Amino acid sequence: MAAKEVKFGRSAREKMLKGVDILADAVKVTLGPKGRNVVIDKSFGAPRITKDGVSVAKEIELEDKFENMGAQLVREVASKTNDIAGDGTTTATVLAQAIVREGAKAVAAGMNPMDLKRGIDLAVAEVVKDLQAKAKKINTSEEVAQVGTISANGERQIGLDIAEAMQRVGNEGVITVEEAKTAETELEVVEGMQFDRGYLSPYFVTNPEKMVADLEDAYILLHEKKLSNLQAMLPVLEAVVQTGKPLVIIAEDVEGEALATLVVNKLRGGLKIAAVKAPGFGDRRKAMLEDIAILTGGTVISEDLGIKLESVTLDMLGKSKKVSISKENTTIVDGAGQKSDIEGRVAQIKAQIEETTSDYDREKLQERLAKLAGGVAVIRVGGSTEVEVKEKKDRIDDALNATRAAVQEGIVPGGGVALLRSSTKITVKGVNDDQEAGINIVRKALQSLVRQIAENAGDEASIVVGKILDKNEDNYGYNAQTGEYGDLIALGIVDPVKVVRTALQNAASVASLLITTEAMIAELPKKESAMPQMPGGGMGGMDF
């Protein structure tokens, strides 16, 4: 086992604080509308330019083991906040640094670290309650756009794109962000349910120009197994022909004489039909077929349920206003399923998302949820260079996460003002002086956001804080972009409650652990041994 170095008390905390400061100072320059960029060197390719706090934090690794421990713990604050709320990483880092700094001073002055921690926890709990009480629910598309704009560092177009995407696919819909091949950023929305399987034969195409099969007002047959025997299918085919409506078959596969007969009938014009492979594999395929059945008001023909293909009637088939099938994708628009059934299925999938521990399963469940709940939107991020596209994509990801958080828990005035106001509303009392000091640490730390935003904008922080607190109005604050004061909600400068709350709770949690640290252990750096000398060449005592 390698030898370890141990540091105690003040010297340990000083080292740790130095690491916290290095990381936090690099991250906090990105805060606010006038925050600066950070350039990150990459071992291959061009350097990366970003204003995303968590991206900066993840790149920092310090040489000194003890300083690095402090930095990594604060990095954990940023990562955890990003995982839960998707934004607010810089906010969390600034708050953590402020609490650690003040806490370290209090411990150095001889206060009990455990009482300080209890005081911090009391104050944070009260601030969280105050934030939730002040939260304003989001109702309009314009408010969604405002949240997106603020998180994208004031780029209005990003906010508008996100608002439009949410309006079209619903709050539960999937919105993905991809890199575009062009210089323009564009929004593409797929309404209805789309899955990545195309027609089994190009002969099913109804529009040869676009090579798609468009079937209006169609019946949908959902079959769990392969279809190769035509005889079993005849009763259902005859019933559909009599209605004069098209039929879409979705099965594990359609092959042999079954596929050949369908193609021949389609070409002769006797039957409007198309066949598609079912999406997914294994259990996921079963679940997705069930989703399509609920969406279209049909039944999955499955041996598990004891239903045979020969006995299928028209009322077991799903219905849809339009089914569009291309070489790669199938889209079902406006299925005839009961709204209550779809809502029940959505609730069931949401419960599975809560329970699953696998990120992959969660992602797949969210895709299924979106397809049932409304659709899928794709924001394609354009730019002149690869570096610009990556930087913009970071901001759009942040803005999207912030917007989702705002829809969940509501919004409060932005620019750090909500926390600044909450600092004046902390009424809880500690049971002793040390706990009271812990409460005051939080009071002071809650000012740090407004101060940092003002500093990044080149203004005097103390004057800004003083002016905001002079007016006893919750929404009154400072617009760093213009340097003016006013009603921040009316100006569209807002923060999602979930982001602010998560940032504060995570910052306080890690900061109070750092304050209560009394010893640190790290491996001693290995001494590089000198290279052994090479033995002399040639043969001794010989002259050449």
UniProtKB/Swiss-Prot annotation:
Enzyme Commission (EC) number: 5.6.1.7
Location of this chain's protein in the cell: Cytoplasm
Source species taxonomy: Bacteria, Pseudomonadati, Pseudomonadota, Alphaproteobacteria, Hyphomicrobiales
Disulfide pattern: none
SUPFAM superfamilies: GroEL apical domain-like (SSF52029), GroEL equatorial domain-like (SSF48592), GroEL-intermediate domain like (SSF54849)
Annotated Pfam families: Cpn60_TCP1
Oligomer status and interactors: Forms a cylinder of 14 subunits composed of two heptameric rings stacked back-to-back. Interacts with the co-chaperonin GroES.
Origin species: Agrobacterium fabrum (strain C58 / ATCC 33970)
Reaction(s) this enzyme catalyzes, per UniProt: ATP + H2O + a folded polypeptide = ADP + phosphate + an unfolded polypeptide
Family: Belongs to the chaperonin (HSP60) family.
Keyword list, A-Z: ATP-binding, Chaperone, Cytoplasm, Isomerase, Nucleotide-binding
One GO CC term on file: cytoplasm
Coiled coil: none
Domain of life according to the entry: Bacteria
InterPro entries, per the entry: Chaperonin_Cpn60_CS, Cpn60/GroEL, Cpn60/GroEL/TCP-1, GroEL-like_apical_dom_sf, GROEL-like_equatorial_sf, TCP-1-like_intermed_sf
Residues involved in ATP binding: T30, L31, G32, P33, K51, D87, G88, T89, T90, T91, G415, D495
Enzyme class: isomerase
GO function terms (MF aspect): ATP binding; ATP-dependent protein folding chaperone; isomerase activity; unfolded protein binding
Biological function: Together with its co-chaperonin GroES, plays an essential role in assisting protein folding. The GroEL-GroES system forms a nano-cage that allows encapsulation of the non-native substrate proteins and provides a physical environment optimized to promote and accelerate protein folding.
NCBIfam families on file: GroEL, PRK00013.1, PRK12849.1, PRK12850.1, PRK12851.1
CDD domains, A to Z: GroEL
Predominant location category: cytoplasm
GO biological process: protein refolding
Protein's name according to its UniProt entry: Chaperonin GroEL
